Regions:
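Acidic, glycine-rich two-metal-ion catalytic cores of nucleic acid-processing enzymes
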Residues: 160-276
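N-terminal leader/targeting and assembly helices and adjacent pre-domain segments
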Residues: 1-159, 262-276
Length: 276
């Protein structure tokens, strides 16, 4: 893929992602709002000290995980099909994805079983740490439960459920879309390479302004089973199977807009290289 083709591919993927963004922003915002109200009720009922102790047993938000399951199932069909068909067009060997939807969903749920609980736990822990800091400050200042609750609700980061939901939803739609595309591309009988596709604009991660780089990763090609490679601001290696890889640093993946494309592998005579 040349730069123009990558740009066109990214635009098509982003249009598909936008179909999911608004829906899941609303669902995540509702779950976050319920979470905040749960903490406030706990605080007013039990007091600051007891609430801090009780928060330690709250590991992750079950509703958030249910939303994640729904998102990943939907992404499996939408992006699995899109990727499968796109690779088929590029290979000039059209494939029929009939019967593969269930396979894609099962692989997505396996992925979510492996990484989803930790992803949701990380989201929950971020909220807990921020609330714990505010409660500690309130205790030190001798504030009442109502006053501490007011501080929590007025906190810029915690108070805007939609802002936090937007960050979570867009990150998870990106992650799910890329893994679904990865699964879809794997179902052909021939080998494919993968290519990192980043949109290059003022928001694209770029060193030294940001700690990680996606700008120079644009166009990087790897064999299907190899990892994309980069370095952070300090020169430390960063690897990823796909954009949004949950094994990569959070700062490398959160709010990422990159996508992954696939290119059929051909031999010296231009023939598709079949899997063995």
């Amino acid at each position: 893929m040349n730069a123009k083709q990558r740009e066109q591919y990214w635009i098509k993927v982003e249009r598909l992602r936008s179909q999911l963004d608004a829906k899941y922003i609303a669902l995540f915002a509702n779950a976050i709002d319920k979470d905040m109200k749960r903490f406030i009720v706990m605080l007013k009922k039990n007091g600051p000290e007891a609430t801090r102790s009780m928060m330690g047993t709250y590991v992750w938000n079950e509703e958030m995980f249910t939303i994640m399951q729904k998102l990943y199932k939907e992404a499996a069909i939408l992006f699995g099909n899109a990727s499968y068909r796109a690779v088929g067009v590029m290979s000039r060997k059209a494939g029929n994805p009939f019967g593969l939807n269930l396979d894609w969903i099962n692989e997505m749920l396996t992925f979510l079983t492996k990484f989803g609980l930790q992803l949701v736990a990380n989201m929950t822990n971020t909220t807990k740490m921020k609330i714990d800091t505010i409660i500690s400050l309130g205790i030190a200042e001798g504030l009442s439960s109502d006053e501490i609750a007011k501080m929590i609700m007025e906190d810029e980061e915690l108070g805007y459920a939609k802002m936090r939901a937007t960050r979570i939803a867009r990150t998870e739609v990106m992650r799910a879309s890329n893994y679904a595309a990865y699964v879809g591309a794997s179902k052909h009988e021939f080998l494919v390479d993968k290519i990192w596709i980043a949109t290059r604009d003022s928001r694209t991660r770029r060193i030294p302004k940001q700690s990680y780089d996606h700008w120079d990763m644009d166009g990087q090609i790897k064999a299907f089973d190899e990892q994309f490679t980069s370095v952070d601001k300090l020169g430390r290696p960063v690897v990823a199977d796909i954009p949004g890889d949950p094994k990569s640093p959070k700062g490398f993946t959160i709010n990422c807009r990159c996508t992954v494309g696939f290119i059929p592998k051909r031999d010296a005579n231009g023939r598709l290289i079949l899997k063995r």
